[in-house]
Amino acid sequence: MESPDRKRQKVLKAKKTMPTSYQKQLEILNKSTNVEAPKTTVGTNIPNGHNQKMFSKNKENVKVMKVSEQINENACGALERHTALLEQVKHWIRQEICMINCNLFDKKLNELNERIGKTQCKSRHEAIAGELFVKIRRLQKRIKTVLSSQRNCLEPNTLPSNTVCKVTDSEAMNLNVTQKSVKSRSKRISSVNHTPLNSSEKAGRKTNLPSTCVEFASESNTDDVMLISVKNSNLTTSITSEQTEIRKNTSRNLSNSPNSMIKVGPVEKKFDFVIDLTREGPSNYSIESPSFTLKSTSKAVLRSKEIIPVAENGNEGFGSFEHLPPLPEPPAPLPEMADKIKDTLPPQKPELKVKWVLRPTSIALTWNIPKVNPNCAPVESYHLFLYYENSDHLTWKKIAEIKALPLPMACTLSQNLASTKYYFAVQSKDIFGRYGPFCNIKSIPRFSENLT
């Protein structure tokens, strides 16, 4: 059995460790027991067994108080942890809200800056547009002036009948020259029928003439004449480029009759360059076809004293040529060129004119395309075919392949073949290898003294 003092010490110790709420309850209980105890002691004497029961009850109360205190402590810890988690969640939510607000603010600020920039650039754009419109108007004015000047240049300059040497399809001109004037001047002057050419295309070019391909140098001008002569069994090429000026010859009358005479002045000129590409070996056409000597001059000058005769025009090709052999069939274009030629048309049909030139005796050929179709591919070369009567070969012969230059083009052919009539045809070939239709066949009779 424990002594009462020891029990009291335990009770005091338990009181000290108890929370304040439980201590207050315990004090209330002690007061009630202290009040009841004197009453009982006054009336009767309490035995020891009753005291033991009282101490056991107090002990149980102390245990209950300890358990409740532990429960309260655990509840307080859980509550503190829960509040800490809530504070952390609140902090995270605040951060997210701040980020969203910042992004939205940045977006709105960028939109506002863009609107401000657009409003500020509007005036600048209007100023730039005004400058562009002014430049466009100036450019349009310049284009109009250039086009008008080109149209004026492209129009044929028709001169009066007393100052112009003009040969049409139905009329011919004879030019007479005295022996003295011919001897005193250059002997290399040759003439062709004068066809009006475009004065806007003035460009003299050097030409390279192999035995199978003839390349021309042409200057498109109303003053230009292109001469080519062909002779004997070797394809001999001599090209002379000249640049001179045509001077008008007034007080000369011109009639439409073939016997009318036109006097033109002597030609005093220095050749800029002469290219002689004569090959000593025989050409491809030395056996089966008539062979020629080709000469080309980009310009010829006519003055008021020397007379160059031109014979009458050849047949315009309206007659019947049923007795002639068929023209050669052109080869088909290469299959790999099919994709490139989809949007283009084959070459157009040229128009050919044939005339006799009296000094030196040669045949002048000129060809042109009156209306050029822009959808056609550029022409690479022109092929010249010849057929002459009293020949052993009953087929057309290609006598020259001429590099394409600005139209119209011209050439002269001089030959010594015994034939009563000559027939000519021209065919064009484009850069893709396609051949166009042949021109209308032109014929011209053998040269005779009656033409003079």
Curated annotation (Swiss-Prot):
Residue span, Fibronectin type-III domain: 346-450
Region spans: Disordered: 185-206
Keywords for this protein: Activator, Nucleus, Phosphoprotein, Repeat, Repressor, Transcription, Transcription regulation
GO terms under cellular component: nucleus
Residues carrying Phosphoserine: 184, 257
Highest taxon, organism lineage: Eukaryota
Tissue: Expressed in testis.
PROSITE patterns given in the database record: FN3
Subcellular location: Nucleus
Family: Belongs to the MCAF family.
Entry-linked PANTHER family: ACTIVATING TRANSCRIPTION FACTOR 7 INTERACTING PROTEIN, ACTIVATING TRANSCRIPTION FACTOR 7-INTERACTING PROTEIN 2
Function description: Recruiter that couples transcriptional factors to general transcription apparatus and thereby modulates transcription regulation and chromatin formation. Can both act as an activator or a repressor depending on the context. Mediates MBD1-dependent transcriptional repression, probably by recruiting complexes containing SETDB1. The complex formed with MBD1 and SETDB1 represses transcription and probably couples DNA methylation and histone H3 'Lys-9' trimethylation (H3K9me3) activity.
Subunit structure: Interacts with MBD1, SETDB1 and SP1. Probably forms a complex with SETDB1 and MBD1.
Name under which the protein is recorded: Activating transcription factor 7-interacting protein 2
Biological source species: Mus musculus
Gene that produces this protein: Atf7ip2
